[in-house]
């Protein structure tokens, strides 16, 4: 779903990788602060004064005015620091490590490329938590896809020291990234992780599990050719990732490369030299970027749990991958399965088959009986394991768990994640391995229902219109005359006919209006009708309901055209608790902002709906952005303090505000 505010805030976590490397005598090497300096010098990535071509080419008149103003004249590097550019806001960023090149907690100055760079002051605010204010960069203003208003993306770059080649990434680094996101979760709208390509799919898979109850966009990206080269893919990859992160709420850990956004736990690196380096053979892309940015909303996961976001900070290192090969012996298998190994990803032949050697099967069975979790996936790039063959059934009988169509990277990181949870037994881990926790595998396809007949589709549309009439007239007090039409008169006219596409289009036009009307009336029956009619898609991928109506973010997040408010905004504003609970259970996004930059939590707190504030906070909502910066929250709290209204102050406190006496 598109975020609504004049500016979106994105934290870029720069871990290293080819994207920011330079050529040296030893080949490509990372260079500290090169990436930030380069992005700051390029107008498409940093246009604080809005004096670039990108900010002034929305119309011919705008371009001509800009061209004649003299602002289009190239500026020398000596004059690049203008008052307006140097006074850009800094953004408060937290990290699990000291921020800066020296690792000290005081301001530092060091020489870089014959220039002196002053590092921001870094403070240790708690055990293992450091805080600093980083200079921000801001993109040119651009039109939000699908809407008429414009937005800029303001971002800060949290650069690791040292920068890592992705081949040196370890499990502790995955946990560190997750911790950085958790520390900054309430301060930013989205997160972009810059990473080397070699192990990017391992990191994206791991983060998909470590980031529990995620409600914001997290995108990993990088490049095959560094930004320092004239011809590169770094510009498109980074700009595309920033554009998606700043304009859409896609609450998943994803990977963006070569104009495509993939689910992070569905990809593998397929080429070391193509710009199209990543493939997702068993799941379609979430976003395709061409002339238009096309989001495949029906495939985007929706958060339906009423829990706040948290980062899990432990992975079990006692896992490994074993690729079967013809002639493998039981001794080889036992060597892999020996302690301290607790989990094995077994890459099997074809659809889950293995050699029938008794010593190999005995090694697998003994390990499973001893508590080792073995997950079978296919060596094939595309496809899934199944029990159709006898050679696959023997593995299942030995205790091996089918892993469906998971990638090797996903299976390994999922196994490591589950084994790191002390509350889970080996049997529970085996059970969870075969279930889609983050959309990482395709569940068995249920039998398809019979195609609806023309009469069924007419009935569905009639039901929709009946609900619309009922809700529209529910507040009227005057009697409405009833018009009775006899059966003969009804039969005299032909029934309303039309194609399935026409009916779907009609429903798509009516459902958002009906949805908002039901929520405003606190009509849970009408709300449930809308959700069912829209074919609410669960995380398992099973579509329920009678119609397939595609609305960005799902019908549960449909926006009012005038105010940009979602149904959750309306329910929170009206104090309709039952609708709030139903919307959250159906995947409503708590971080959506309307045209004024407000969240549902802000409206609930402003209206004094304490119960709804508690419910939204428990679901992960937080105040931020324009609500704090424009002074809306501060003014409301100060007015309550001045009036001595402790009840109102308490509601804002429960919403996360710390009143100043």
Each language-model region and where it sits:
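Start-of-repeat signature of ankyrin repeats
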Residues: 511, 564, 597, 629-633
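Accessory alpha-helical/coil subdomains and C-terminal extensions
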Residues: 7, 13, 35, 40-149, ...
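Ankyrin-repeat inter-repeat connecting loop/turn
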Residues: 556-557, 590, 623-624, 659
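Conserved hydrophobic site in ankyrin repeats
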Residues: 530-531, 583, 616, 652
């Amino acid at each position: 779903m598109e975020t609504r505010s004049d500016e979106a805030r994105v934290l870029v976590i720069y871990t290293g990788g080819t994207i920011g490397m330079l050529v040296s005598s030893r080949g490509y090497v990372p260079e500290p602060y090169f990436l930030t300096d380069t992005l700051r010098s390029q107008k498409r990535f940093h246009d604080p004064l809005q004096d670039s071509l990108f900010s002034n080419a929305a119309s011919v008149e705008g371009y001509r005015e800009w061209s004649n103003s003299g602002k289009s004249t190239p500026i020398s590097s000596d004059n690049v620091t203008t008052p307006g550019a140097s006074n850009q806001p800094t953004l408060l960023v937290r990290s699990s490590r000291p921020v800066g090149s020296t690792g000290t907690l005081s301001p530092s100055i060091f020489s870089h490329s014959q220039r002196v760079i002053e590092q921001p002051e870094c403070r240790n605010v708690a055990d293992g938590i450091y805080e600093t204010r980083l200079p921000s960069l801001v993109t040119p203003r651009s039109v939000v896809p699908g809407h008429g208003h414009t937005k800029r993306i303001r971002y800060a770059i949290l650069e690791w020291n040292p920068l890592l080649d992705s081949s040196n990434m370890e499990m502790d680094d995955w946990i560190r990234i997750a911790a950085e996101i958790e520390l900054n979760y309430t301060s930013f709208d989205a997160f972009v992780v810059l990473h080397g390509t070699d192990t990017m799919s391992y990191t994206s898979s791991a983060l998909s599990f470590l980031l529990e109850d995620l409600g914001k966009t997290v995108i990993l990206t990088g490049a095959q050719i560094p930004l320092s080269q004239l011809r590169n893919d770094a510009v498109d990859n980074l700009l595309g990732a920033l554009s998606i992160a700043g304009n859409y709420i896609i609450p998943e850990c994803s990977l963006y490369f070569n104009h495509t956004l993939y689910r992070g736990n569905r990809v593998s690196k397929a080429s070391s030299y193509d710009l199209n380096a990543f493939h997702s053979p068993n799941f379609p892309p979430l976003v395709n970027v061409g002339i238009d940015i096309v989001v495949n909303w029906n495939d985007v996961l929706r958060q339906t749990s009423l829990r706040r976001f948290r980062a899990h900070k432990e992975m079990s290192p006692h896992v490994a991958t074993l690729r079967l090969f013809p002639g493998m012996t039981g001794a080889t298998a036992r060597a892999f399965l020996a302690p301290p190994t607790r989990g094995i990803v077994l890459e099997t032949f074809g659809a889950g088959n293995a050699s029938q050697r008794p010593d190999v099967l005995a090694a697998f069975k003994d390990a499973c009986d001893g508590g080792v979790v073995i997950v079978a996936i296919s060596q094939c790039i595309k496809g899934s394991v199944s029990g159709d063959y006898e050679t696959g059934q023997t593995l299942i009988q030995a205790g091996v768990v089918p892993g469906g169509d998971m990638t090797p990277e996903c299976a390994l990181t999922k196994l490591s994640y589950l084994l790191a949870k002390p509350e889970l037994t080996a049997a529970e881990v085996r059970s969870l391995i075969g279930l889609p926790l983050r959309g990482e595998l395709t569940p068995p396809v249920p039998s398809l229902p019979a195609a609806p007949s023309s009469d069924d589709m007419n009935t569905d549309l009639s039901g929709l219109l009946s609900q619309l009439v009922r809700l529209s007239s529910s507040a009227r007090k005057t009697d409405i005359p009833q018009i009775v039409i006899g059966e003969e008169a009804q039969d005299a006219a032909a029934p309303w006919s039309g194609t399935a596409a026409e009916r779907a289009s009609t429903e798509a036009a009516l459902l958002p209006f009906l949805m908002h009307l039901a929520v405003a009336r606190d009509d849970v029956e009408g709300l449930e009708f809308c959700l069912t009619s829209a074919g609410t898609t669960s995380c398992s991928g099973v579509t329920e309901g009678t119609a397939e109506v595609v609305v960005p973010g799902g019908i549960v997040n449909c926006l009012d055209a005038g105010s940009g408010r979602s149904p959750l905004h309306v329910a929170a504003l009206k104090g309709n608790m039952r609708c709030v609970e139903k919307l959250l259970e159906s995947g409503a996004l708590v971080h959506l902002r309307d045209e004024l930059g407000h969240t549902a939590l802000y409206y609930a707190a402003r209206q004094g709906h304490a119960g709804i504030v508690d419910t939204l906070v428990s679901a992960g909502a937080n105040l931020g952005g324009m609500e704090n910066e424009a002074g809306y929250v501060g003014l409301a709290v100060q007015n309550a303090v001045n009036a001595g209204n402790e009840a109102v102050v308490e509601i804002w406190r429960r919403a996360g505000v710390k009143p100043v006496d």
